[in-house]
From Swiss-Prot:
Tagged with keyword Ribonucleoprotein: yes
Gene Ontology BP terms: mitochondrial translation
Transmembrane segments: none
Family: Belongs to the mitochondrion-specific ribosomal protein mS34 family.
Name the UniProt record assigns to this protein: Small ribosomal subunit protein mS34
InterPro entries attached to this UniProt entry: Ribosomal_mS34
Tissue: Widely expressed (at protein liver).
MF GO annotations: structural constituent of ribosome
Keywords: Mitochondrion, Ribonucleoprotein, Ribosomal protein
This protein's GO CC annotations: mitochondrial inner membrane; mitochondrial small ribosomal subunit; mitochondrion
Coiled coil feature spans: none
The gene coding this protein: Mrps34
């Protein structure tokens, strides 16, 4: 007997999608989540107060969307960086904007999300991704006439330290051992820092015990 074909529950699926859309609409927007009372330095939505270290930056610096709202096309293709990056790193650190989605319910369009390609300490990523911490008050726009000088960077060759001199006592012991064995080489003894994988002294015994426990395959 052929099995009866079960039709999908179209009404239940439609109801699930409607509930998901309602939940999405009821979620607070960025302009509500990250709204800030500049007198008390608290966020009205959560009631949390900003940390003391952020108070000075809130009054002097700007959020990312505050900068982009003043530019045509919200600054697509421009470079933005952060004050903390300028202080901490000598290498160029910046985002190149590829996409901006402002929150159109915000009064000055100064909230939203942005995407870009990150270059951190002179190394650029291959793909664009969403920019994090856009609500922080430490974003700065790189002027167009300074972009070429800001992005100029020559990577320095990495100096890998493969060996170091032995401590004085060990060095004296090695030289004495050479003299005892009749070795006349004058090469300075150096300690190799490269990792070499060495098997433990009981490795063969462990392998033999493991083979016995496993038994012979049938």
């Amino acid at each position: 007997m052929a099995r009866k074909k079960v039709r999908p529950r179209l009404i239940a699926e439609l109801a699930r999608r409607v509930r998901a859309l309602r939940e999405q609409r009821n979620q607070p927007r960025d302009s509500q989540l990250y709204a800030l009372d500049y007198e008390t330095l608290t966020r009205p939505h959560s009631g949390r107060r900003l940390p003391v270290r952020a108070w000075a930056d809130v009054r002097r610096e700007s959020r990312l969307l505050q900068l982009l709202a003043r530019l045509p096309l919200f600054g697509l293709g421009r470079l933005v960086t952060r004050k903390s990056w300028l202080w901490q790193h000598d290498e160029p650190c910046y985002w190149r904007l590829t996409r901006v989605r402002p929150d159109y319910t915000a009064q000055n369009l100064d909230h939203g999300r942005a995407w870009g390609i990150l270059t951190f300490k002179g190394k650029s990523e291959d793909t664009a991704r969403e920019i994090e911490q856009v609500m922080y008050h430490d974003w700065r726009l790189v002027p167009k006439h300074e972009e070429e000088a800001f992005t100029a960077f020559t990577a320095k060759p990495e100096d890998r330290l493969n060996s170091v001199p032995y401590p004085p006592l060990l060095r004296a012991m090695i030289l004495a051992e050479r003299q005892k064995n009749g070795d006349t080489s004058v090469q300075e003894p150096l300690l190799n820092l490269e990792r070499t994988r060495m098997r433990p002294w009981d490795y063969p015994a462990k392998q033999e015990t493991k083979g016995r426990a496993k038994g012979t395959p049938v």
